[in-house]
Amino acid sequence: MAKTIQAIRGMNDCSPTESPLWQWVEGKVRSVLQNYGYSEVRMPIVESTPLFARAIGEVTDVVSKEMYTFWDNDEQLTLRPEGTAGCVRAAIEHGWIYNQEQRLWYMGPMFRHERPQKGRYRQFHQAGVEVFGIPNPEIDAELIMLTARLWKELGIAEHVTLQLNSIGSLEARKNYRSALVAFLQQHVDLLSEEEKERLEKNPLRILDTKNQALQEVLNDAPKLLAYLDDDSREHFAQLCALLDAVGIQYEVNPKLVRGLDYYNKTVFEWVTSALGAQGTVCGGGRYDGLVEQLGGHATTGVGFAMGLERLVLLVQEVNQSIRLPSAVDIYVVYQGEGTTLAAFQLAETLRTELPQLRVMTHCSGGNFKKQFKRADKSGATLALVIGESEVQNQQVVVKHLLGGAEQQTLALDDIVDYIKNNF
């Protein structure tokens, strides 16, 4: 026997029993985004490597350690580690945002070479939203309201908490960076080698350290909010007032900075502790300089992304009220001379007349006992039975697989109306 080939570590298959929940979650995401008037876009999963280096920042962990990069002739390409950079590139390239506002969303796989763990994999899926051309804090509030509505739709609203911060302008962050570095240099003995490297290249990333001793020291560190420019401070105050007005609770977290360099002003995360250690379910913020940084006209931007693996896990963990549909509603079984043609004609008629129902035809042969066993396993509500006598009499037997109702024999011409009225 030939040696079997396994999936790549951190890149998972989605089984037939898992996919209904994924489809349900993705359907809720699409529904809420469409309800708010957002338009779907689709971008390639492979982009030019310099796109991410320029957008995300060369000293970030994502670019320096986690990207899947390869050469195609003379061009360096990367499997996308996130969606914002590609969406901005597409918007500039196709003129979607020139002198106009855009509310866009996308969904698909992303790739990062991280250590696989629960809810975090090397191939993972994100739903993302990007809004261009609206500088006001109202749109920041709308994105947060949108996500809050989605959590209600998914039945997880009681298990997520909103954390909010403002990281101000580039100039404000430079001033804060100097103060933070001066503070951390007094505690350099607590820093790991990786954190010492961050101190040199990207000190703000130390604020979300998992080092417990350092976390306690950081409680006394300078607060970024104290270094905000007036415009950022006013923007943040208006955002908080809007969230207060619509009743969305939040916690101002002065250590929240996000892991990508393109953010400014508002940053936010929805976090949960229902999956063990506190984890981020959704995160985003403003990136008002990114479009210009990637060669477009100066255009404001704000967005978020949510990890679908973690979202599916959270729904599984806390929402026990979901009733997912089975893969099959009606199972057509047949046995005997001339029954195959009749069964296939019946199944196609049902698919035409009742397109909302899922109709499966048994194609494996075998006696009725074997076929009913397969019908039960499919989760179907009804089995429609065609034998030789049913073919001769233009009839079909209706067998209820759930609920215990007695089986009935109906004329073929009546079966569509019967199912419409009773199913």
Swiss-Prot record:
It is an enzyme of class 6 (ligase). InterPro entries: aa-tRNA-synth_II, aa-tRNA-synth_II/BPL/LPL, Anticodon-bd, Anticodon-bd_dom_sf, His-tRNA-ligase, HisRS-like_core, HisRS/HisZ, HisRS_anticodon. GO terms for biological process: histidyl-tRNA aminoacylation. Keywords: Aminoacyl-tRNA synthetase, ATP-binding, Cytoplasm, Ligase, Nucleotide-binding, Protein biosynthesis. It catalyses: tRNA(His) + L-histidine + ATP = L-histidyl-tRNA(His) + AMP + diphosphate + H(+). Its main location: cytoplasm. It holds the Pfam family HGTP_anticodon. Gene3D superfamilies: Anticodon-binding domain, Bira Bifunctional Protein, Domain 2. GO terms for molecular function: ATP binding; histidine-tRNA ligase activity. The lineage of its organism: Bacteria, Pseudomonadati, Pseudomonadota, Gammaproteobacteria, Pasteurellales. Homodimer. Belongs to the class-II aminoacyl-tRNA synthetase family. It is found in: Cytoplasm. The keyword Thylakoid does not apply. GO terms for cellular component: cytoplasm. This is Histidine--tRNA ligase. Coiled coil: none annotated. Its EC number is 6.1.1.21.
